[in-house]
């Protein structure tokens, strides 16, 4: 897409009061360091010094145009954002200077559309409601967001563990809290950034949890996360039709999804949270879905209520993502780690660690 009138102004390092990472123009393949001037704070907004920001596949898919040609430039991704408030808008009353808060996938929701008025602000009809669409996201040393979309970080959650709860955490927690009941047999497919959190949530929801993985070496670690059992992907076909699970949380976006659906009990629920690039679609056997009376549930991140609840749940049960941390100056290495390697299990950036002292305050 063409350039747009951005609130954040790209400038020289000398003029800048913040530093970001993203693309300045269409066609770039290597992420750039982008110095910029912060926008004027609106009455209902807060400015935070970003302490940690997560690196998520969504950021890469979106900014690289893998979900469609609707990216505006400059594009600064980032939607797992935690930091401390350094400035308050005139009408802000919910928070105070120094509070540790976070922002997730949506901002600037209209509050008026069908989705917003039916508890689905994460599906707001206004495209600009996505945190990094037509404004800078959280891959930056500083971030401006609305008071209404900020969430206080419970003191029980270390800040370096908090960022990934704002996407990976809420993405699995939101549908799980609606579909899972204590005593259910729950399968989690794909024990990566999403799956390792889904296992912990399912365990503390009072279920019997099975981690389903194609990596035998992860078995002990999966058990340590709270799983009661581990099923290797190579053994899935042997169990088709046996009715193993009330609910399956599918965290993978590629491969034969249909084989996992057929592990459900009659009337079971299949939650799909893994999203591939556009065009990489999967096929499922509609006949088996109908005959098994299965329910297929799609879910994308969560709304503000879901975010508040996942933070409280994580704080209560000490559920934290396993995170690899990188310095801000190594941001491109962190992106490469997420895109092309297999981190255990999420990657976050220490944003107050740039080589420029003025951006670390």
What positions do the PLM features span?
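Helix-to-beta-strand junctions that scaffold the AdoMet/dcAdoMet cofactor pocket
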Residues: 264-266
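Adenosine-nucleotide cofactor-binding segment
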Residues: 182, 188-191, 203-259
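Glycine-rich beta-strand-centered segment in the early N-terminal region that forms part
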Residues: 37-53, 66-114, 151-157
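Rossmann-fold NAD(P)-binding glycine/threonine-rich loop
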Residues: 275-292, 304-310
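Short glycine-centered segments of the SAM/dcSAM-binding site in methyltransferase folds
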Residues: 100, 185, 268-269, 295
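N-terminal Rossmann-fold NAD(P) dinucleotide-binding loop
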Residues: 195-196
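C-terminal hydrophobic helical "lid"/dimerization subdomain
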Residues: 2-16, 204, 304-361
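NAD(P)H dinucleotide-binding glycine-rich loop of Rossmann-like/cofactor-binding domains
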Residues: 109-189
């Amino acid at each position: 897409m063409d350039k747009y009138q951005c609130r954040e102004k790209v400038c020289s390092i000398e003029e800048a009061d913040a530093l970001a990472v993203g693309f300045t123009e269409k066609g770039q393949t290597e992420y750039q360091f982008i110095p910029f001037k912060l926008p004027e704070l609106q009455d209902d907004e807060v400015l935070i010094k970003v302490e940690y920001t997560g690196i998520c596949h969504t950021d890469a898919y979106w900014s690289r145009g893998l979900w469609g040609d609707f990216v505006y430039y400059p594009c600064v991704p980032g939607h797992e954002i935690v930091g401390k408030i350094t400035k308050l808008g005139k009408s802000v009353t919910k928070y105070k200077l120094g509070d540790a808060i976070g922002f997730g996938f949506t901002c600037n929701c209209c509050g008026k559309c069908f989705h917003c008025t039916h508890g689905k602000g994460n599906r707001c009809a206004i495209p600009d409601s996505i945190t990094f669409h037509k404004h800078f996201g959280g891959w930056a040393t500083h971030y401006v967001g609305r008071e209404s979309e900020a969430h206080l970080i419970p003191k029980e959650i270390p800040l370096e563990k908090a960022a990934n709860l704002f996407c990976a955490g809420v993405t699995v927690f939101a549908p799980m809290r609606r579909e899972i009941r204590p005593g259910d047999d729950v399968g989690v497919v794909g024990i990566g950034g999403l799956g390792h959190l889904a296992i912990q949530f399912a365990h503390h929801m009072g279920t019997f949890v099975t981690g389903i993985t194609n990596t035998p070496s992860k078995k002990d670690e999966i058990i340590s996360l709270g799983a009661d059992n581990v099923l290797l992907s190579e053994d899935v076909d042997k169990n088709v039709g046996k009715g193993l699970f009330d609910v399956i949380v599918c965290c993978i976006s590629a491969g034969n999804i249909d084989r996992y659906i057929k592990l459900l009990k009659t009337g079971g629920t299949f939650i799909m949270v893994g999203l591939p690039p556009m065009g990489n679609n999967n096929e499922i056997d509609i006949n088996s879905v109908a005959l098994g009376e299965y329910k297929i549930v799609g879910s994308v991140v969560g709304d503000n209520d879901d975010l508040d609840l996942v933070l409280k749940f994580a704080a209560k049960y000490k559920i934290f993502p396993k995170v690899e941390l990188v310095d801000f100056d190594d941001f491109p290495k962190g992106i490469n780690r997420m895109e092309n390697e297999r981190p255990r299990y999420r990657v976050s950036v220490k944003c107050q660690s740039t080589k420029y002292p003025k951006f670390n305050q």
